[in-house]
Amino acid sequence: MTTIELQIQDNTFLRQFETKVGNYLAKIEYSLQERKIFLTKLIIPEEIRDDEFRESFIKAVLHHIEENNLRVVPTSPQIASFLRRNKQYKELLPVGIRI
């Protein structure tokens, strides 16, 4: 699988991570509480929705979160499923959270 390079924007006003592909906007909505970020909803337009894009988008957002020393609480089923399949991100989970 090839990795797609994405530019991630943290839209703090709308509380969502965004990336634009052509005329389409993919986003992950979040809620920030102390040093934890709750990833609540993954929205990818149907026109750009595929497994490779979804994986690359989630990885890019997790990298951004890691750079900002935050912990991830995945309340979105799609993001929780990604974290279950990709154990290398388990250090981003807060103490006591298992998925």
Describe the predicted segments one by one.
Residues 1-49, 64-73, 80, 97-99:
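Non-catalytic substrate-recognition and accessory regions of acyl/acetyltransferase enzymes
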Residues 77-97:
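Conserved active-site alpha-helix within GNAT-family acetyltransferase domains
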